[in-house]
Amino acid sequence: MIVPVRCFSCGKVVGDKWESYLNLLQEDELDEGTALSRLGLKRYCCRRMILTHVDLIEKFLRYNPLEKRD
């Protein structure tokens, strides 16, 4: 859904790195580990926050509960 703002374990801010992470993966064609290292995420707890995030917001935006089905 929404990227967590802080790491659950250590409290470091990780929410501002999500867009940069996606850009590094797509435009620079880096692997996940290298991209996380370039973003300055050294601790495995912080790396976990980015690696395991599932971005579901686009699916929820398409859902309209007021729309009638035929």
Curated annotation (Swiss-Prot):
Q: Per the UniProt entry, what are the Gene Ontology biological process annotations, in alphabetical order? A: nucleolar large rRNA transcription by RNA polymerase I; ribosome biogenesis; RNA-templated transcription; termination of RNA polymerase I transcription; termination of RNA polymerase III transcription; transcription by RNA polymerase I; transcription by RNA polymerase II; transcription by RNA polymerase III
Q: Which residues form a coiled coil?
A: none
Q: Which Pfam families match?
A: RNA_pol_N
Compartments annotated for it: namely: Nucleus, Nucleolus
Which of UniProt's keywords are assigned here?
A: DNA-directed RNA polymerase, Isopeptide bond, Metal-binding, Nucleus, Ribosome biogenesis, Transcription, Ubl conjugation, Zinc
Q: Which InterPro entries match?
A: RNA_pol_su_RPB10, RNA_pol_suN_Zn-BS, RPABC5/Rpb10
Instruction: Indicate the secretion signal residues.
Output: none
Tell me the domain of life: Eukaryota
Give a GO molecular function annotation for the protein: DNA binding
Chain residues that bind Zn(2+): 7, 10, 45-46
Gene Ontology cellular-component terms for this entry are: nucleoplasm; nucleus; RNA polymerase I complex; RNA polymerase II, core complex; RNA polymerase III complex
Sites of the Glycyl lysine isopeptide (Lys-Gly) (interchain with G-Cter in ubiquitin) crosslink: 59
Other facts noted in the record for this chain? Present with 5300 molecules/cell in log phase SD medium.
Quaternary arrangement and interactors, per the entry? Component of the RNA polymerase I (Pol I), RNA polymerase II (Pol II) and RNA polymerase III (Pol III) complexes. Component of the RNA polymerase I (Pol I) complex consisting of 14 subunits: RPA135, RPA190, RPC40, RPA14, RPB5, RPO26, RPA43, RPB8, RPA12, RPB10, RPC19, RPC10, RPA49 and RPA34. The complex is composed of a horseshoe-shaped core containing ten subunits (RPA135, RPA190, RPB5, RPO26, RPB8, RPB10, RPC10, RPA12, RPC19 and RPC40) where RPA135 and RPA190 form the DNA-binding cleft.
Family annotation (HAMAP family): RNApol_arch_Rpo10
User: What is stated as this protein's family in its record?
Assistant: Belongs to the archaeal Rpo10/eukaryotic RPB10 RNA polymerase subunit family.
Function in brief: DNA-dependent RNA polymerases catalyze the transcription of DNA into RNA using the four ribonucleoside triphosphates as substrates. Common component of RNA polymerases I, II and III which synthesize ribosomal RNA precursors, mRNA precursors and many functional non-coding RNAs, and a small RNAs, such as 5S rRNA and tRNAs, respectively. Pol II is the central component of the basal RNA polymerase II transcription machinery. Pols are composed of mobile elements that move relative to each other. In Pol II, RBP10 is part of the core element with the central large cleft.
Protein name as it appears in the record: DNA-directed RNA polymerases I, II, and III subunit RPABC5
* Organism per entry: Saccharomyces cerevisiae (strain ATCC 204508 / S288c) (Baker's yeast)
The gene is RPB10
